[in-house]
């Protein structure tokens, strides 16, 4: 079984001639300014700009468009008294705004320290689309654990009880950090039996990087184990959970 590593902005969209497409869109927007309020137009604009030059244009041009998306969404929800509504991925009409929100979150994740706005955007994404097709719950949980928000991390993992190994190991860490040692130990032993490579990688001082597909990893495989170690080992070590896990998982 394989799962996506993370959301890849623009992965589902592409154009053969981004220069020409951008010019066409700008002409259309000049003739019909109200289209600036269309999430479908905005996602096409962002994807086209990204194809022109993914690195240099991302912050000066793409970021302002993504900021506009957040403001526009709030206006739409407020105007329709729909602040508590869901915009689930299963409905194609919802996908442009969800893609745009996920893209904005992806930019946030590159910062070493999570801002309050970053947490708000990820939490909003999960409220809008609880099934979380974009996998926002994983980086949100990681940020919770890094920021010692263990109750939030535990609550999040419990919302997805049969989730991928990453979230299940995160539940163990949250339980341990909150002092629920017996529960943490029971979960850890279950995971050590079912997904042993992740725990093995976590406990080792150093491991070789396996071949990793940038789109998918094998659930419980060497690639997922390496990625989990990369993202979480420092937090496990800081909380004193590595030594505990080494003793309890035997």
Model-derived segments and spans:
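Solenoid-like repeat scaffolds
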Residues: 27-34, 123-130, 156-165, 189-198, ...
């Amino acid at each position: 079984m394989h799962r996506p590593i993370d959301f890849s902005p623009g992965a589902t969209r592409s154009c053969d001639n981004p220069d020409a497409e951008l010019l066409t869109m700008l002409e259309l927007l000049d003739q019909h300014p109200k289209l600036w309020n269309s999430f479908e137009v905005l996602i096409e604009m962002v994807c086209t700009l990204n194809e022109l030059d993914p690195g240099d244009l991302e912050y000066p041009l793409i970021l302002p468009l993504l900021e506009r998306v957040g403001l526009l969404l709030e206006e739409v929800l407020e105007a329709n008294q729909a602040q508590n509504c869901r915009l689930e991925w299963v409905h194609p009409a919802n996908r442009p705004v969800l893609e745009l929100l996920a893209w904005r979150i992806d930019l946030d994740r590159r910062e070493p320290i999570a801002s309050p706005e970053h947490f708000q955007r990820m939490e909003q994404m999960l409220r809008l689309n609880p099934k979380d097709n974009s996998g926002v719950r994983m980086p949100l949980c990681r940020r919770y654990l890094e920021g010692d928000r263990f109750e939030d991390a535990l609550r999040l993992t419990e919302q997805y009880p049969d989730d991928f190994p990453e979230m299940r190991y995160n539940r163990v860490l949250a339980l341990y950090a909150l002092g629920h040692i017996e529960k943490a130990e029971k979960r850890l032993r279950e995971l050590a039996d079912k997904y042993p490579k992740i725990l093995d990688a976590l406990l080792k001082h150093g491991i070789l990087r396996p071949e990793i597909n940038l789109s998918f990893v094998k659930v419980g495989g060497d690639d997922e184990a390496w990625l989990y170690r990369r993202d979480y080992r420092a937090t496990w070590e800081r909380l004193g959970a590595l030594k505990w896990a080494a003793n309890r998982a035997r």
